[in-house]
Amino acid sequence: MISLLKKLYFTFSRSSRIIITLVIIDQLTKWWFINNLRWKPGLMLKVTSVLNMVYTWNYGISFGLMREYYQYSNTIFLITNMIIVCYLYYLMICSKTIGSFAGYSFVIGGAIGNLIDRFCRGAVFDFIHFHYRNYSFPVFNLADCFITLGVIILMEDYFSTKKVIEETSKGNYDNLQIEVMAEKIRHTDHDSKI
């Protein structure tokens, strides 16, 4: 029982530091763009030939989907997102690898950053806009970048773990090689986590 409580404490404290750091970075960048540039919605600042900073509010979900249902759906978005964040936190606590731990931390940090916007401002503030010739990527923010990076980390972790499992089931390695490969992707002590 004590070891379980110790594991939960270390997981909570380390994950909380990562998540809180990501949320602070996201909220500070949004605060800076909202309060210091004081643009009118729709105006843009050209940074490079493919990157603009724009002042826009997203009343929908990802990429502005369902924004026309905003007046009915903001509460539903908030509740659904909070449930998803709680479930992802549970998965993170149960994670067996550093990669999955980091991936879930990034997804949760980004999700909480956008939840704060939706709760405090009624919409998510987006400001990064990539475009090239006739292609225009939907406007996004750092929280969206954190979520995307977290998903990429989770996918890489899944496939690298799957590869070790497949190789060991084929019998291509002796026990020492298996242990070395598994140790590279698996953590055995929460003290060694990020």
Curated annotation (Swiss-Prot):
Q: Chief localization class?
A: membrane
Locate the active site. 126, 144
| Pathway annotation | Protein modification; lipoprotein biosynthesis (signal peptide cleavage)
Any Pfam family matching the protein: Peptidase_A8
Which GO terms of the molecular function aspect are on file?
aspartic-type endopeptidase activity
- Establish whether keyword Cell inner membrane is in the entry: yes
Residues folding into a coiled coil are none
Name of this chain's protein: Lipoprotein signal peptidase
Give the classification, highest ranks.
Answer: Bacteria, Pseudomonadati, Pseudomonadota, Alphaproteobacteria, Rickettsiales
